[in-house]
Every structure is written in structure tokens, then in C-alpha cells.
Amino acid sequence: MFTINAEVRKEQGKGASRRLRAANKFPAIIYGGAAAPVAIELDHDKVWNMQDKAEFYSEVLTVVVDGKEEKVKVQAVQRHAFKPKLTHIDFVRA
């Protein structure tokens, strides 16, 4: 079971996303179900080490957003074209 700590994004847009990536974080979103979508930011290195395992893409993950747990599955992952970097992840509520 994977547990990911996240923070709610305070800023959105291209400039804010670039600042996140420069700070070794990256944007993500949680959507689906009855609740509203939540834009979050994740620590790149922690998630990078988790995504090396195949179970990351098939199991239900726990994302802790401001102390509240969300059960999610990975819907889509975007990677940098040639650097070993994640640029965005979509999570869907399980």
C-alpha cells in the first residue's frame, strides 16, 4: 500500500506549475465521485521512487491532503520528454 502526502495548491496556471517544478515538486489533481476536484502538489522524489513499482499503477493508493485521507487510483501520468521527471499525475477517486 502506498501513502502519498500532498498539499492543496494555492496557485494554479503555467507559471505556478513551473515554480513548483523548480522547487522539486509537481502538480496533480484528484477527481471523480461526488466530491469536487482537488488540485494538489506532490514531492517529486518521493513519488518518483514509488512509481518505479508496477503496483503503483494498479493498486488503490492513499493520498493524505491536509490531514484527510483520499483513496485513489492513478488515471494518467505525464513525464518530461527527455529528463527523468514527472510533470503531472491525474488521480481518480476509488
Swiss-Prot record:
Keywords: Ribonucleoprotein, Ribosomal protein, RNA-binding, rRNA-binding
Gene Ontology CC entries for this record: cytosolic large ribosomal subunit
InterPro entries for the chain: Rbsml_bL25/Gln-tRNA_synth_N, Ribosomal_bL25/Gln-tRNA_synth, Ribosomal_bL25_short, Ribosomal_L25_dom, Ribosomal_uL5_bac-type
Molecular function per GO: 5S rRNA binding; structural constituent of ribosome
GO biological process terms held by the UniProt record: translation
Keyword RNA-binding: yes
Domain of life: Bacteria
Statement: the UniProt record of this protein carries the keyword Ribonucleoprotein: yes
Quaternary structure and interacting proteins, as annotated: Part of the 50S ribosomal subunit; part of the 5S rRNA/L5/L18/L25 subcomplex. Contacts the 5S rRNA. Binds to the 5S rRNA independently of L5 and L18.
Family the UniProt entry places it in: Belongs to the bacterial ribosomal protein bL25 family.
HAMAP family reported for this sequence: Ribosomal_bL25
Function (record text): This is one of the proteins that binds to the 5S RNA in the ribosome where it forms part of the central protuberance.
Name of the protein in its database record: Large ribosomal subunit protein bL25
Originating species: Klebsiella pneumoniae subsp. pneumoniae (strain ATCC 700721 / MGH 78578)
